[in-house]
Design a protein with these regions (language model features):
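Structural microenvironment flanking redox-active thiols in thiol-disulfide oxidoreductases
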Residues: 71-112, 120-129
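Short, thiol/selenol-centered motifs that function as redox-active sites or metal-ligating centers
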Residues: 64-74, 98-99, 138, 195-198
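N-terminal "domain-start" segment that seeds a small globular fold
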Residues: 16-50
C-alpha cells in the first residue's frame, strides 16, 4: 500500500526541478524509520503511525482546510486516491497543528468527497518525523516505510498564486507508476508550492 501525505503556502525553488536545497528527509534512512506515534483519526479512532512501516505502500498528503492550494488540488487528491487505492495503495491525509478545527476539516473532506482516512497531528510529531513543511505536500512510502518520493503533486502551481492552464509534469503520478513497475521515480524529490506549516 502507498501512503500520500499532503500539507500546506510557500514559494521556493522551481518545482519543475529536483529540490537542490541539500536538505534530506529523515526518511532517507533504513526501513521502519517512522516512529510509532499514538495519533487520532478524524473519526475518533486510533491511528498508530508505525503502521506505515508495513503492510502496503502509502501516499501521504499533508493538508490544511484553509490553504488555497489544498482547495485547488482537492479534486486531484480524490481522483488519485480512487485510482490507486483500487490497485492496493493506501492513501492518508495528515492535518498538522491546531490552527483549524475538526469541524473545518470535516467540512473540507465532505465538500470535496475525500473518503480516505484523515489523521490529526496536533503536536506536529509525525509531520516533523516526515520532514514535511508545506501544505499540500505528498509523500510516497514503500511497504517498509521507506521514502520513495516527496514533494509537489505536479507543476500546475509553480509559485504561490501562479498556475499553469494545465500541469505539464505529474510528479506524484509518475512516482506511483514507476513504483508499480519496480523502478525508481523520475524525480525522488521536488519543491512543494503551498502554505508553510506553522
Amino acid at each position: 500500500m502507498v501512503l500520500v501525505l499532503v500539507v500546506g503556502c510557500q514559494s521556493g525553488a522551481s518545482p519543475d526541478r529536483p529540490d537542490e536545497s541539500g536538505q534530506s528527509s529523515p526518511l532517507n534512512q533504513a526501513a521502519g524509520s517512522i516512529p510509532n506515534l499514538p495519533l487520532k483519526r478524524l473519526d475518533g479512532s486510533a491511528f498508530a503511525s508505525g503502521s506505515l512501516n508495513r503492510d502496503s505502500a502509502t501516499v501521504l498528503f499533508l493538508l490544511s482546510p484553509e490553504c488555497p492550494l489544498c482547495l485547488d488540488y482537492a479534486y486531484t487528491f480524490r481522483t488519485l486516491a480512487e485510482e490507486y487505492q483500487a490497485r492496493g495503495i493506501r492513501f492518508v491525509g495528515l492535518f498538522p497543528g491546531t490552527y483549524f478545527s475538526e469541524l473545518q476539516i470535516k467540512k473540507y473532506c465532505s465538500r470535496f468527497r475525500l473518503e480516505f482516512p484523515m489523521v490529526l497531528d496536533p503536536d506536529y510529531a509525525l509531520t516533523r518525523a516526515l520532514g514535511a513543511n508545506t501544505t499540500p505536500e505528498a509523500l510516497l512510502l514503500n511497504e517498509q516505510g521507506q521514502l520513495v518520493y516527496q514533494g509537489g503533486i505536479d507543476n500546475w502551481a509553480y509559485e504561490v498564486g501562479q498556475k499553469r492552464l494545465e500541469p505539464t509534469e505529474h510528479y506524484l503520478r509518475d512516482a506511483l507508476q514507476a513504483f508499480e513497475n519496480g523502478q525508481k521515480p523520475p524525480l525522488a524529490r521536488t519543491k512543494p508550492v503551498g502554505c508553510l506549516i506553522e
